[in-house]
């Protein structure tokens, strides 16, 4: 298992524990994997099971796009596995965006 995956798994478990214990449903989290990618993530617990969001036909891509907004957002946290998958997707999307920006900057210069 790669170091980044282990980091995300541990972060997901800690994040879920904090959401369940804290009176305030908002948890801010800074991800800093070994590859140098840093990402600030803010979770707001809604106490709504993920299955309800799926029943309402909320696509995963919409949830991910909302997560990338700088404003507060909502996400249902029902398992550390779901949080881990979400954080992994966020980091991958951020890396892709940075790669495209670097390539675009090289082409225009």
From Swiss-Prot:
Domain of life: Eukaryota
Tissue: Not expressed in normal tissues except in testis. Expressed in 22% of melanomas, in bladder and lung carcinomas.
InterPro entries listed in its UniProt record: BAGE-like
Main location: secreted
Key words of the record: Secreted, Signal
GO cellular component: extracellular region
Note: The ancestral BAGE gene was generated by juxtacentromeric reshuffling of the KMT2C/MLL3 gene. The BAGE family was expanded by juxtacentromeric movement and/or acrocentric exchanges. BAGE family is composed of expressed genes that map to the juxtacentromeric regions of chromosomes 13 and 21 and of unexpressed gene fragments that scattered in the juxtacentromeric regions of several chromosomes, including chromosomes 9, 13, 18 and 21.
Protein name: B melanoma antigen 2
Species the sequence originates in: Homo sapiens (Human)
